[in-house]
C-alpha cells in the first residue's frame, strides 16, 4: 500500500512538472509569434487594500528581442526606451534621464519578460495556464515581484497583464489596438534633450 502511495505521489509530481513545462512553452511560443507590434495601454494601480493609487495610459512599441519604447502619457509623462544596448529612462517633468546597460537589466520585471521573451528569464518562474490566461510565480522570493499574470491569444496578441508586488500593490495593464507591424527605427532611439541631466550608470 505504501509503495502504491509513493508511486502515486511520484506520478502526480511528474504530471504537475510536465504541465508547468507545457504552460511555459506555450506562453513563449505565443509571444514568439509576434516579433514587432504597437499598442495603446491603460494602467490601474491599487494598494494591497484595494484602494486606487494611480490610473494612467500610454503607448507601447516592441521589436523583439531587444528594442522597445514604453511611453507613459498620463498622469505624468515618462519614457523607457531600449536601443538594443542601452536602456534609457526619461522623465520630462524633472528633466532627468538615466542610462543603464540593457544586458544588466533584470529579467524579473513584467515588462522585460514580455519584450525579451527570453527562455532564461522564464525559467525563473512556475507557470500555470488556463486557456489564454497564464499565471507566473517566481521560484525565488528574493525579488519584489510576488505574482505576474498575462492574457495572450494563440496568435500572440497580448490582451492584458498584471503584476503583484510583495507588499500587495497591484499594477494592471490593458492593451488595446495591437498592430503587428514594424515600427519606425526612430522609436527605438533616444537623444538627450537640451538641458536634461543624465545619470549615466554604464560604468
Curated annotation (Swiss-Prot):
Residues 1-21 form the signal peptide. Keywords: Chaperone, Periplasm, Protein transport, Signal, Transport. GO terms for cellular component: outer membrane-bounded periplasmic space. InterPro entries: LolA/LolB/LppX, OM_lipoprot_carrier_LolA-like, OM_lipoprot_carrier_LolA_Pbac. One of its GO terms (biological process) is lipoprotein localization to outer membrane. It is found in: Periplasm. The keyword Chaperone applies. Pfam families: LolA. Participates in the translocation of lipoproteins from the inner membrane to the outer membrane. Only forms a complex with a lipoprotein if the residue after the N-terminal Cys is not an aspartate (The Asp acts as a targeting signal to indicate that the lipoprotein should stay in the inner membrane). Monomer. HAMAP family: LolA. NCBIfam families: lolA. Belongs to the LolA family. This is Outer-membrane lipoprotein carrier protein. It comes from Yersinia enterocolitica serotype O:8 / biotype 1B (strain NCTC 13174 / 8081). The gene is lolA.
